[in-house]
């Protein structure tokens, strides 16, 4: 794990980079404040190069990432996990270019990182009301889903 201050438009975060041993992908983790007993505001987001970096309107235009930083800054403490994806999260074939889907392995990576940070009870930033299962095995509990 590498760590460094990260000044952003939303304030000064701490940036940690976790490297996945099986595939070498490097996952970015932005934290604001220190975890405590209160539930922590968390966003786990898959890499979306065309939306996050190039603001492609058909690819989410980075809105969820910016909204997540805004929400964490407003709350005063929280965590954003940016899960790296092969090919920047894109799938390209004869049918065109589209975003790949986040799968169970990506949730597992995010959960391992959150557990390593010492989080237990989280307020998950999401617009997807479906229940995320399997986090209990990492000692995590979603106490609230927060739309952005």
Protein language model features and the residues they cover:
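Catalytic domains of riboflavin
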Residues: 1-148
């Amino acid at each position: 794990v590498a760590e460094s201050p990260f000044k952003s438009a939303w304030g000064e975060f701490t940036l940690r980079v976790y490297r996945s041993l099986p595939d070498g992908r490097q996952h970015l983790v932005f934290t604001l404040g220190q975890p405590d007993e209160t539930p922590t505001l968390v966003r786990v987001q898959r890499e979306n190069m065309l939306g996050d970096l190039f603001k492609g309107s058909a690819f989410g235009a980075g809105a969820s990432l910016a909204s997540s930083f805004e929400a964490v800054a407003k709350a005063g403490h929280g965590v954003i996990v940016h899960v790296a994806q092969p090919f920047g999260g894109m799938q390209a074939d004869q049918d065109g270019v589209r975003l790949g889907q986040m799968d169970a392995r990506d949730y597992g990576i995010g959960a391992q990182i959150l557990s390593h940070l010492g989080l237990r009870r989280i307020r998950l930033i999401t617009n997807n009301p479906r229940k995320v299962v399997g986090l209990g095995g990492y000692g995590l509990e979603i106490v609230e889903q927060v739309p952005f």
